[in-house]
Regions:
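Secretory/organelle targeting and membrane-embedding segments
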Residues: 2-3, 80-266, 270-609
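N-terminal intrinsically disordered, low-complexity tails
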Residues: 6-69, 74-81
Length: 609
C-alpha cells in the first residue's frame, strides 16, 4: 500500500518591506551596452547551434568610462543592415566553415531559435567550487554559442574582496580548467568578461542587499535588461533561507508591472529530511511564488534523461509494452569511480541516501514509471512524476533491513592506482558511519507497475563512472530455440546517461549458417555518431531553461517533499540498527556483496556495465 504523508507545506506569498538600511558603496563597475538598440536578439534559423553571427560585436567601453547609454559605441558601417543581408552573409559563412557532417539529416531539429529576454544573472556563492566548475562554464558556453541575449549581464556576489578585473581573471583561469570548449575562445571570453561585475557582501547583511538592488537598477538603465533578473544560489544549503529572506526584505523579488520577471534557482540538497524541506519550502514561499522557483537537479538536464520522455511518448512501439505485462524489472545504476573529492565535511552531513537517492535516483525512477502527461507543460509533467513517487510503497524497518543495503568504501585500487578509504579522507570522522553506497528494491503500487521491482544503486569509488537505466523485459512464454541458443537472455533496453550517451536494445538473432544457432545481438544508438555533435552540458540546458521560464526539468515543492518521505523511513531505520560494519567494500569493486542478494534471491543479477 502506498504510504500516507503529512499535508504538504503551505506556501503563502508575501514580500517583506524593503530594507531601511542605507546603501553601501557599490563593489564593482558596469560597462556600457553593445552598440545596437536594446531588444531581443535575432537568430537566423538557418544557422546551426554554435555558428557565430555575421559581423563582430563591438567591445564595450572600459569600466572607467561613465555608465550612460550615450557612451555606447556607434554601429559598424560594414554590419548587415537587413535580414536579407544577414541571411546571405550567413549562408556564405556556413559554406566556408561548416563541415559536411552538418548535412546529416539527423541534425535537423537541433537548431534552437529561442533566446532569453534581456536579463541580469545574479550568482550568489560566485567564489565557490560549483560556480567555477559548472555555472560559469555553462554561461560561457551559452554566450559563445549565441544563446544568450546581447544585453546579458552577470553580477557575481561573494564575501571575499575582489576587484572586477581580479575576479574576471579568476573566472578565466577556471574556464581553462573546466570549460568543455578548449582552448578558450578569447574573443568570446573578452566580450562576456566585459559584462561581468563583482559585488561584495555578507549574505546576512541587509545593507549589502540594498546596495545590490541599486547596482541592479543601474544596470537596468544602462543595458536595457528590463527588470528581468535570475538569482542563482550556488552556496552552502545553510545559506538558502537567509539569502531568500534578504532578497524579499530588499524588494528584489518584486516583478515589474510591465512584465519584468524575477526567478530564483536553488541547488540541491533541498533540505536534509522531510521536516527541513517543508520548512525551507515555507520560507521560500514567503518571498517567491512557486512559478518563480526553480529547484535544480542537474541529472534532469542530461541528454539521455531528456530523451527518455521523447523515447517513450514520441514512438508508438515502446509505450504499449512499457508495463508489468512485458517488463520483468528495472535497474537504475549511478556509479562513480571518484571518492568525495575533498568534500568530507559536506558528505558527512549527507551520505549517499541524501546526496543521490532523494533526488537523482528517484527522479530517474519517476521518469521511467510516470504516465503520459496531458501536455508537455511543466506542471502537467510534474503532476505525473509526483503521482509515481506517492505510489512508492513506504518501508517499515523490517523492509528496510530486507530491501535496502548501505556500504562504505575502504582502501583499494581504482584505475590502477591505490586510494584511501572513506574514513581516511580529509575532514571525515575516523569512525564515520556515513554511507558511500546504497542499493534499494522499491515497489510502485499502481496499475502499470504493481509487482515489478525497481532496483536502484549508487556508489562512490566503484570500478568506473557510469549511469544507466536498464529495462529488463520478460522471457518469451515458450522458448522454441532453447537448445540452439548459446546464452538465451530476455530482451533488454539500456539507456546510457553517462558517459557515451545513447540507447542500446538487445535481442536474439540467428547466426549465419546452415544450422539454427541463436545469439544475442544489439542495436546501438549514440548521440555522437548519430548527430555528429556534442551534447550540451546539463547545466547549460537547465540554466537556459530557467532563463526561458521553462520549469519542466525542475522539481516542484510537493515533489521534493514526497521524495523525502521515501528516504526518511530508511534513515530512521538505520538509526535504530546501531553501528554498521564499515567499511564494507573495497574501493574499485562494485559495492558490498550483500547488495547482490537483493536480486539473487529472486533469480536476478545486476547488469554488468
Amino acid at each position: 500500500m502506498a504510504r500516507t504523508k503529512p499535508d504538504p507545506a503551505t506556501t503563502p506569498t508575501s514580500t517583506g518591506p524593503a530594507s531601511e538600511a542605507s546603501a553601501i558603496p557599490l563593489h564593482g563597475t558596469v560597462e556600457t551596452p553593445p552598440a545596437t538598440e536594446p531588444g531581443p536578439r535575432v537568430v537566423d534559423p538557418s544557422v546551426p547551434v554554435g555558428e557565430p553571427p555575421v559581423g563582430p560585436t563591438e567591445p564595450l567601453v572600459p569600466a572607467s568610462e561613465p555608465l550612460t547609454p550615450a557612451s555606447a559605441p556607434s554601429p559598424r558601417k560594414d554590419a548587415p543592415r537587413t535580414m536579407r543581408d544577414l541571411r546571405l552573409a550567413t549562408e556564405a559563412r556556413r559554406r566556408s566553415t561548416t563541415p559536411r557532417a552538418a548535412d546529416n539529416p539527423l541534425r535537423e531539429g537541433l537548431r534552437l531559435e529561442r533566446v532569453p529576454d534581456p536579463h541580469i544573472f545574479v550568482l550568489f556563492g560566485a567564489t565557490g567550487d560549483l560556480a567555477h566548475r559548472k555555472v560559469v562554464p555553462a554561461l560561457h558556453q551559452l554566450w559563445r554559442t549565441h544563446l544568450l541575449p546581447h544585453e546579458f549581464t552577470l553580477v557575481c556576489v561573494g564575501r571575499r574582496p575582489y576587484t572586477d578585473e581580479a575576479f574576471r581573471d579568476e573566472l578565466k583561469a577556471s574556464l581553462a580548467k573546466f570549460s568543455r570548449s578548449q582552448p578558450i575562445d578569447r574573443e568570446a571570453w573578452d566580450d562576456m568578461a566585459s559584462r561581468i561585475t563583482y559585488h561584495r557582501g555578507d549574505f546576512n547583511d541587509p545593507a549589502a542587499y540594498a546596495a545590490l538592488a541599486d547596482h541592479l537598477d543601474t544596470i537596468d538603465l544602462a543595458h536595457g535588461t528590463r527588470g528581468n533578473r535570475l538569482f542563482y544560489l550556488a552556496t552552502q544549503p545553510s545559506a538558502f533561507p537567509e539569502i531568500i529572506a534578504q532578497l524579499g526584505h530588499a524588494g528584489l523579488d518584486h516583478e515589474h508591472h510591465d512584465g519584468g520577471w524575477r526567478r530564483v534557482v536553488i541547488e540541491k540538497p533541498f533540505g536534509r529530511d522531510l521536516e527541513s524541506a517543508i520548512r525551507l519550502n515555507r520560507e521560500v514561499g514567503k518571498v517567491f511564488r512557486e512559478r518563480q522557483v526553480y529547484r535544480i537537479d542537474h541529472y534532469l538536464g542530461k541528454e539521455t534523461v531528456r530523451n527518455l520522455l521523447v523515447f517513450r511518448f514520441a514512438n508508438g512501439i515502446f509505450e504499449p509494452i512499457w508495463n508489468r505485462r512485458h517488463i520483468d524489472h528495472v535497474q537504475i545504476t549511478v556509479a562513480e569511480s571518484l571518492g568525495i573529492e575533498g568534500r568530507g565535511a559536506f558528505y558527512e552531513e549527507t551520505g549517499a541516501s541524501r546526496d543521490f537517492l532523494q533526488n537523482h535516483l528517484l527522479q530517474l525512477l519517476s521518469l521511467v514509471a510516470m504516465e503520459p502527461p496531458a501536455t508537455f507543460e511543466a506542471d502537467a509533467l510534474r503532476d505525473e512524476k509526483v503521482k509515481v513517487i506517492r505510489a512508492i510503497a513506504e518501508m517499515t524497518p523490517a523492509q528496510v533491513r530486507r530491501d535496502v543495503v548501505r556500504g562504505q568504501y575502504g582502501p583499494g585500487w581504482v584505475s590502477g592506482k591505490p586510494v584511501v578509504g572513506y574514513r581516511q579522507e580529509p575532514h571525515v570522522d575516523p569512525e564515520s558511519e556515513t554511507e558511500t553506497f546504497i542499493a534499494a528494491r522499491l515497489m510502485i503500487d499502481d496499475w502499470r507497475w504493481s509487482g515489478i521491482p525497481f532496483y536502484l544503486r549508487m556508489g562512490k569509488r566503484l570500478p568506473k563512472r557510469a549511469t544507466e537505466i536498464a529495462i529488463q523485459f520478460k522471457e518469451v512464454p515458450h522458448q522454441l530455440f532453447r537448445d540452439s541458443a548459446a546464452d538465451p537472455e530476455p530482451n533488454l533496453l539500456a539507456m546510457r546517461i553517462q558517459p557515451d550517451e545513447g540507447i542500446m536494445l538487445r535481442f536474439g538473432a540467428k547466426v549465419p549458417g546452415l544450422g539454427v544457432d541463436v545469439r544475442n545481438v544489439t542495436m546501438d544508438f549514440t548521440y555522437g555518431s548519430a548527430f555528429q555533435t556534442d551534447s550540451p552540458d546539463a547545466y547549460e540546458t537547465l540554466i537556459l531553461d530557467a532563463l526561458l521560464g521553462d520549469a519542466s526539468l525542475f522539481t516542484r515543492a510537493d515533489e521534493v517533499e514526497e521524495a523525502w518521505s521515501i528516504v526518511d523511513p530508511i534513515i530512521a531505520a538505520w538509526a535504530e540498527e546501531g553501528s554498521p560494519d564499515f567499511p564494507s567494500y573495497e574501493a574499485g569493486t562494485w559495492g558490498p556483496a550483500v547488495a547482490d542478494d537483493l536480486l539473487a534471491r529472486e533469480g536476478r543479477r545486476w547488469r554488468r556495465i
